[in-house]
A protein has these predicted regions:
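Non-catalytic connector elements of ABC transporters
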Residues: 13, 233-336
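The feature captures the beta-strand-to-loop junction immediately N-terminal to the Walker
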Residues: 34-36
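Helix-to-loop junction immediately C-terminal to a conserved catalytic motif
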Residues: 49
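Conserved ABC ATPase "signature" region
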Residues: 96-113, 165
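Conserved ABC ATPase signature
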Residues: 117-121, 125
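A short, proline-enriched helix->beta-strand linker immediately N-terminal to the Walker B motif
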Residues: 136-140
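ABC ATPase "signature
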Residues: 199-203, 211
Length: 336
Protein backbone atom coordinates (compact mmCIF):
# COMPACT_ATOMS: atom_id res chain seq x y z
CA UNK A 1 0.00 0.00 0.00
CA UNK A 2 1.47 3.34 -1.09
CA UNK A 3 -1.31 5.71 -0.07
CA UNK A 4 -4.34 5.44 2.20
CA UNK A 5 -6.96 7.89 3.37
CA UNK A 6 -9.49 7.24 6.12
CA UNK A 7 -12.73 9.16 6.69
CA UNK A 8 -11.39 12.11 4.72
CA UNK A 9 -13.45 15.30 4.58
CA UNK A 10 -12.21 18.28 2.57
CA UNK A 11 -13.75 21.70 2.79
CA UNK A 12 -13.59 24.69 0.46
CA UNK A 13 -14.79 27.77 2.27
CA UNK A 14 -17.68 26.68 4.47
CA UNK A 15 -18.78 23.81 2.23
CA UNK A 16 -17.75 20.17 2.49
CA UNK A 17 -16.71 19.22 -1.04
CA UNK A 18 -15.48 15.73 -0.13
CA UNK A 19 -17.18 13.83 2.69
CA UNK A 20 -15.95 10.82 4.69
CA UNK A 21 -13.88 9.17 1.94
CA UNK A 22 -11.76 6.10 2.70
CA UNK A 23 -9.60 4.53 -0.02
CA UNK A 24 -6.14 3.19 -0.76
CA UNK A 25 -3.71 2.91 -3.67
CA UNK A 26 -1.50 -0.13 -4.15
CA UNK A 27 1.74 -0.55 -6.09
CA UNK A 28 1.32 -1.68 -9.68
CA UNK A 29 -2.28 -0.54 -10.19
CA UNK A 30 -3.90 2.24 -12.16
CA UNK A 31 -6.98 3.60 -10.41
CA UNK A 32 -9.47 5.92 -12.09
CA UNK A 33 -11.32 8.44 -9.93
CA UNK A 34 -14.54 8.80 -11.86
CA UNK A 35 -17.43 11.18 -11.38
CA UNK A 36 -19.40 13.98 -13.02
CA UNK A 37 -18.28 17.60 -13.05
CA UNK A 38 -18.52 19.08 -9.58
CA UNK A 39 -18.32 15.73 -7.77
CA UNK A 40 -15.17 16.76 -5.87
CA UNK A 41 -12.62 14.71 -7.82
CA UNK A 42 -9.96 17.42 -8.20
CA UNK A 43 -10.44 18.52 -4.59
CA UNK A 44 -9.87 14.95 -3.38
CA UNK A 45 -6.80 14.65 -5.61
CA UNK A 46 -5.34 17.89 -4.21
CA UNK A 47 -5.88 16.68 -0.65
CA UNK A 48 -4.31 13.28 -1.33
CA UNK A 49 -1.30 14.98 -2.91
CA UNK A 50 -0.87 17.32 0.05
CA UNK A 51 -1.93 20.52 -1.71
CA UNK A 52 -5.03 20.91 0.51
CA UNK A 53 -5.39 20.31 4.24
CA UNK A 54 -8.38 18.09 5.04
CA UNK A 55 -10.97 19.23 7.56
CA UNK A 56 -11.18 15.71 9.01
CA UNK A 57 -9.67 12.27 8.56
CA UNK A 58 -6.12 11.14 7.93
CA UNK A 59 -3.85 10.46 4.96
CA UNK A 60 -0.96 7.99 5.03
CA UNK A 61 1.66 8.26 2.27
CA UNK A 62 4.59 5.95 1.58
CA UNK A 63 7.12 7.42 -0.83
CA UNK A 64 7.05 10.51 -2.99
CA UNK A 65 3.90 11.80 -4.64
CA UNK A 66 3.88 13.51 -8.04
CA UNK A 67 0.86 15.35 -9.41
CA UNK A 68 0.15 16.68 -12.90
CA UNK A 69 -2.59 19.28 -12.81
CA UNK A 70 -5.23 19.66 -15.49
CA UNK A 71 -3.70 22.61 -17.37
CA UNK A 72 -0.64 21.49 -19.42
CA UNK A 73 1.37 24.65 -18.79
CA UNK A 74 4.83 24.55 -20.37
CA UNK A 75 7.77 26.93 -20.09
CA UNK A 76 9.02 28.88 -23.12
CA UNK A 77 11.67 26.30 -23.87
CA UNK A 78 12.02 23.23 -26.01
CA UNK A 79 10.06 20.12 -25.15
CA UNK A 80 13.18 18.34 -23.92
CA UNK A 81 14.12 21.31 -21.75
CA UNK A 82 10.64 21.33 -20.21
CA UNK A 83 10.94 17.70 -19.15
CA UNK A 84 14.47 18.24 -17.87
CA UNK A 85 13.24 21.23 -15.86
CA UNK A 86 10.76 18.99 -14.05
CA UNK A 87 13.59 16.59 -13.28
CA UNK A 88 15.67 19.45 -11.89
CA UNK A 89 12.82 20.48 -9.57
CA UNK A 90 12.56 16.85 -8.47
CA UNK A 91 16.24 16.79 -7.54
CA UNK A 92 17.48 14.43 -10.25
CA UNK A 93 21.25 14.82 -10.85
CA UNK A 94 22.08 16.88 -13.93
CA UNK A 95 23.95 14.02 -15.59
CA UNK A 96 20.82 11.84 -15.59
CA UNK A 97 18.27 14.38 -16.77
CA UNK A 98 18.77 14.13 -20.53
CA UNK A 99 18.42 10.35 -20.70
CA UNK A 100 15.49 10.33 -18.27
CA UNK A 101 13.69 13.02 -20.26
CA UNK A 102 14.17 11.26 -23.60
CA UNK A 103 13.05 7.95 -22.11
CA UNK A 104 9.82 9.52 -20.85
CA UNK A 105 9.13 11.25 -24.17
CA UNK A 106 9.71 7.98 -26.00
CA UNK A 107 7.35 6.12 -23.64
CA UNK A 108 4.49 8.53 -24.36
CA UNK A 109 5.14 8.70 -28.11
CA UNK A 110 6.58 12.22 -28.09
CA UNK A 111 10.30 11.68 -28.69
CA UNK A 112 10.03 13.35 -32.11
CA UNK A 113 8.95 16.57 -30.36
CA UNK A 114 12.09 16.88 -28.23
CA UNK A 115 13.62 19.84 -30.09
CA UNK A 116 10.35 21.67 -30.76
CA UNK A 117 9.62 24.93 -28.91
CA UNK A 118 6.71 24.37 -26.52
CA UNK A 119 4.85 27.34 -28.01
CA UNK A 120 4.49 25.53 -31.36
CA UNK A 121 2.75 22.43 -29.97
CA UNK A 122 -0.87 21.47 -30.60
CA UNK A 123 -3.21 20.68 -27.72
CA UNK A 124 -2.64 16.95 -28.02
CA UNK A 125 1.14 17.39 -28.21
CA UNK A 126 1.12 19.58 -25.10
CA UNK A 127 -0.82 16.86 -23.26
CA UNK A 128 1.81 14.29 -24.25
CA UNK A 129 4.65 16.46 -22.97
CA UNK A 130 2.71 17.15 -19.76
CA UNK A 131 2.39 13.40 -19.19
CA UNK A 132 6.05 12.83 -20.07
CA UNK A 133 7.11 15.28 -17.34
CA UNK A 134 5.00 13.40 -14.79
CA UNK A 135 6.37 10.01 -15.83
CA UNK A 136 9.99 11.19 -16.00
CA UNK A 137 10.24 12.07 -12.30
CA UNK A 138 9.27 8.47 -11.37
CA UNK A 139 7.18 9.16 -8.27
CA UNK A 140 5.97 6.34 -6.05
CA UNK A 141 2.43 7.67 -6.43
CA UNK A 142 1.50 9.50 -9.63
CA UNK A 143 -1.67 11.59 -9.72
CA UNK A 144 -3.11 12.94 -12.96
CA UNK A 145 -5.98 15.42 -13.10
CA UNK A 146 -8.02 15.09 -16.32
CA UNK A 147 -5.00 14.30 -18.53
CA UNK A 148 -7.14 13.89 -21.67
CA UNK A 149 -9.43 16.91 -21.26
CA UNK A 150 -10.17 19.11 -24.26
CA UNK A 151 -8.94 16.70 -26.95
CA UNK A 152 -10.89 15.60 -30.01
CA UNK A 153 -11.89 11.94 -30.23
CA UNK A 154 -9.08 10.72 -32.50
CA UNK A 155 -6.29 12.51 -30.60
CA UNK A 156 -7.69 11.33 -27.28
CA UNK A 157 -7.93 7.72 -28.47
CA UNK A 158 -4.31 7.71 -29.65
CA UNK A 159 -3.07 9.31 -26.43
CA UNK A 160 -5.05 6.82 -24.32
CA UNK A 161 -3.36 3.91 -26.09
CA UNK A 162 0.12 5.33 -25.53
CA UNK A 163 -0.61 6.42 -21.96
CA UNK A 164 -1.75 2.96 -20.87
CA UNK A 165 1.63 1.36 -21.52
CA UNK A 166 3.57 4.40 -20.32
CA UNK A 167 1.72 4.60 -17.00
CA UNK A 168 1.97 0.90 -16.23
CA UNK A 169 4.64 0.25 -13.58
CA UNK A 170 4.93 -2.53 -11.02
CA UNK A 171 6.51 -0.14 -8.52
CA UNK A 172 4.14 2.80 -8.87
CA UNK A 173 0.52 3.51 -8.04
CA UNK A 174 -1.29 5.81 -10.46
CA UNK A 175 -4.49 7.72 -9.70
CA UNK A 176 -6.15 9.31 -12.74
CA UNK A 177 -9.06 11.73 -12.42
CA UNK A 178 -11.53 11.39 -15.30
CA UNK A 179 -15.19 12.20 -15.91
CA UNK A 180 -15.52 10.18 -19.10
CA UNK A 181 -16.38 6.51 -18.59
CA UNK A 182 -14.58 5.43 -21.77
CA UNK A 183 -11.30 6.83 -20.43
CA UNK A 184 -11.75 4.99 -17.14
CA UNK A 185 -12.49 1.71 -18.94
CA UNK A 186 -9.43 2.10 -21.17
CA UNK A 187 -6.99 2.77 -18.33
CA UNK A 188 -8.09 1.49 -14.98
CA UNK A 189 -7.61 -1.70 -13.03
CA UNK A 190 -9.97 -0.30 -10.44
CA UNK A 191 -12.55 2.48 -10.26
CA UNK A 192 -13.38 4.86 -7.45
CA UNK A 193 -16.73 6.50 -8.17
CA UNK A 194 -17.35 9.86 -6.53
CA UNK A 195 -20.83 11.40 -6.54
CA UNK A 196 -21.60 14.63 -4.66
CA UNK A 197 -18.35 14.32 -2.73
CA UNK A 198 -19.11 10.78 -1.52
CA UNK A 199 -17.26 7.62 -2.51
CA UNK A 200 -20.16 5.43 -3.60
CA UNK A 201 -18.37 2.52 -5.29
CA UNK A 202 -14.95 0.91 -5.63
CA UNK A 203 -13.94 -2.10 -7.68
CA UNK A 204 -12.78 -3.44 -11.05
CA UNK A 205 -14.63 -1.77 -13.95
CA UNK A 206 -16.18 -4.97 -15.29
CA UNK A 207 -17.49 -6.02 -11.87
CA UNK A 208 -19.09 -2.64 -11.23
CA UNK A 209 -20.70 -2.71 -14.66
CA UNK A 210 -22.06 -6.22 -14.18
CA UNK A 211 -23.29 -5.62 -10.64
CA UNK A 212 -23.51 -1.93 -9.65
CA UNK A 213 -23.97 -1.63 -5.88
CA UNK A 214 -26.80 0.90 -5.98
CA UNK A 215 -29.32 2.59 -8.24
CA UNK A 216 -27.36 5.86 -8.25
CA UNK A 217 -24.17 4.09 -9.31
CA UNK A 218 -26.03 2.19 -12.02
CA UNK A 219 -27.56 5.37 -13.42
CA UNK A 220 -24.17 7.07 -13.43
CA UNK A 221 -22.68 4.09 -15.30
CA UNK A 222 -25.17 4.50 -18.12
CA UNK A 223 -28.07 2.31 -16.99
CA UNK A 224 -30.65 4.66 -18.47
CA UNK A 225 -33.40 2.13 -19.16
CA UNK A 226 -35.95 1.50 -16.42
CA UNK A 227 -38.60 -1.19 -16.01
CA UNK A 228 -40.51 -1.33 -12.73
CA UNK A 229 -43.43 -3.50 -11.73
CA UNK A 230 -43.98 -2.29 -8.16
CA UNK A 231 -41.91 -5.13 -6.75
CA UNK A 232 -38.69 -5.10 -8.74
CA UNK A 233 -36.71 -2.42 -10.55
CA UNK A 234 -34.66 -3.43 -13.59
CA UNK A 235 -32.15 -0.91 -14.95
CA UNK A 236 -30.58 -1.50 -18.35
CA UNK A 237 -27.95 -0.13 -20.67
CA UNK A 238 -28.37 -0.11 -24.48
CA UNK A 239 -26.03 -3.11 -24.67
CA UNK A 240 -28.59 -5.17 -22.74
CA UNK A 241 -31.40 -4.56 -25.25
CA UNK A 242 -31.61 -6.44 -28.55
CA UNK A 243 -34.21 -6.13 -31.29
CA UNK A 244 -35.48 -9.65 -31.88
CA UNK A 245 -38.44 -10.57 -34.15
CA UNK A 246 -39.33 -13.41 -31.76
CA UNK A 247 -38.33 -11.60 -28.58
CA UNK A 248 -40.57 -11.99 -25.52
CA UNK A 249 -41.34 -8.28 -25.05
CA UNK A 250 -43.33 -5.88 -27.21
CA UNK A 251 -42.17 -2.28 -27.43
CA UNK A 252 -42.94 0.84 -29.41
CA UNK A 253 -40.26 3.15 -30.80
CA UNK A 254 -40.87 6.62 -29.35
CA UNK A 255 -37.68 8.27 -30.53
CA UNK A 256 -34.86 7.46 -32.95
CA UNK A 257 -31.64 9.46 -32.77
CA UNK A 258 -29.34 8.99 -35.79
CA UNK A 259 -25.84 7.67 -35.13
CA UNK A 260 -22.95 7.18 -37.51
CA UNK A 261 -23.80 3.53 -38.21
CA UNK A 262 -27.35 3.21 -36.93
CA UNK A 263 -29.73 4.83 -34.48
CA UNK A 264 -30.27 5.06 -30.75
CA UNK A 265 -33.84 4.02 -30.04
CA UNK A 266 -36.05 4.98 -27.15
CA UNK A 267 -38.50 2.13 -26.58
CA UNK A 268 -41.69 2.26 -24.52
CA UNK A 269 -42.76 -0.95 -22.82
CA UNK A 270 -45.74 -1.80 -20.67
CA UNK A 271 -43.87 -1.09 -17.44
CA UNK A 272 -41.15 1.30 -18.41
CA UNK A 273 -38.77 2.62 -21.01
CA UNK A 274 -35.47 1.29 -22.33
CA UNK A 275 -32.88 2.30 -24.92
CA UNK A 276 -31.19 0.29 -27.65
CA UNK A 277 -28.79 0.83 -30.53
CA UNK A 278 -30.01 -0.56 -33.86
CA UNK A 279 -28.17 -0.88 -37.19
CA UNK A 280 -29.49 0.74 -40.35
CA UNK A 281 -32.18 0.65 -41.53
CA UNK A 282 -33.48 1.29 -38.02
CA UNK A 283 -37.14 1.27 -36.96
CA UNK A 284 -38.85 4.67 -36.97
CA UNK A 285 -40.84 6.38 -34.21
CA UNK A 286 -44.28 4.85 -33.92
CA UNK A 287 -43.23 1.40 -35.11
CA UNK A 288 -43.90 -1.64 -32.93
CA UNK A 289 -40.98 -4.00 -32.37
CA UNK A 290 -40.12 -6.99 -30.25
CA UNK A 291 -37.08 -7.11 -28.00
CA UNK A 292 -35.23 -9.31 -25.58
CA UNK A 293 -33.28 -8.17 -22.52
CA UNK A 294 -29.90 -9.78 -21.88
CA UNK A 295 -28.68 -8.64 -18.47
CA UNK A 296 -29.26 -5.49 -16.49
CA UNK A 297 -29.15 -4.56 -12.81
CA UNK A 298 -32.01 -5.58 -10.54
CA UNK A 299 -33.02 -3.78 -7.36
CA UNK A 300 -36.04 -3.86 -5.05
CA UNK A 301 -38.66 -1.44 -6.25
CA UNK A 302 -38.24 1.91 -4.57
CA UNK A 303 -41.66 3.14 -5.68
CA UNK A 304 -43.95 1.17 -3.37
CA UNK A 305 -46.88 3.53 -3.90
CA UNK A 306 -47.27 2.81 -7.61
CA UNK A 307 -50.35 1.15 -8.97
CA UNK A 308 -50.18 -2.63 -8.78
CA UNK A 309 -48.24 -4.01 -11.72
CA UNK A 310 -47.78 -7.55 -12.89
CA UNK A 311 -44.37 -9.07 -12.29
CA UNK A 312 -41.88 -8.66 -15.11
CA UNK A 313 -42.14 -12.37 -15.89
CA UNK A 314 -45.93 -12.21 -16.15
CA UNK A 315 -45.68 -9.09 -18.29
CA UNK A 316 -43.33 -10.93 -20.64
CA UNK A 317 -45.72 -13.86 -20.81
CA UNK A 318 -48.76 -11.73 -21.54
CA UNK A 319 -46.97 -9.88 -24.32
CA UNK A 320 -45.79 -13.19 -25.76
CA UNK A 321 -49.39 -14.32 -25.85
CA UNK A 322 -50.20 -11.28 -27.99
CA UNK A 323 -52.24 -9.15 -25.59
CA UNK A 324 -52.51 -5.66 -27.09
CA UNK A 325 -51.39 -2.62 -25.15
CA UNK A 326 -54.50 -0.69 -24.18
CA UNK A 327 -54.98 3.01 -23.59
CA UNK A 328 -54.15 2.68 -19.87
CA UNK A 329 -50.91 0.85 -20.68
CA UNK A 330 -49.94 3.50 -23.21
CA UNK A 331 -50.51 6.18 -20.57
CA UNK A 332 -48.15 4.31 -18.25
CA UNK A 333 -45.53 4.35 -20.99
CA UNK A 334 -45.88 8.09 -21.33
CA UNK A 335 -45.52 8.55 -17.56
CA UNK A 336 -42.41 6.33 -17.30
Amino acid sequence: MLLRCEHLTVRRGKRDVVTDVSAELRAGEIVALLGPNGAGKSTLLDALAGALTPAAGRIERHGRVGIALQAPDLARRTVLANVMLALAWWGVPRAERGDRAREALRAIGAEHLASRPAATLSGGERRRVHLARAIAVRPDVLMLDEPFAGLDAEVRSNLLEDALSALRSSARATLVVVHDRAEAWALADRLLILLDGRLVASGPPRELLEQPPSVEVARFLGFDGRIEDGRELLLTRPAHIALDPVGPLAARVTRATPLEDGARLELALEHGRVYAVAPLPAPRPGEDVRIRIDGGARFPSGDRGNRGYQSLDRASASVQEGEPAGADQQAERDEA
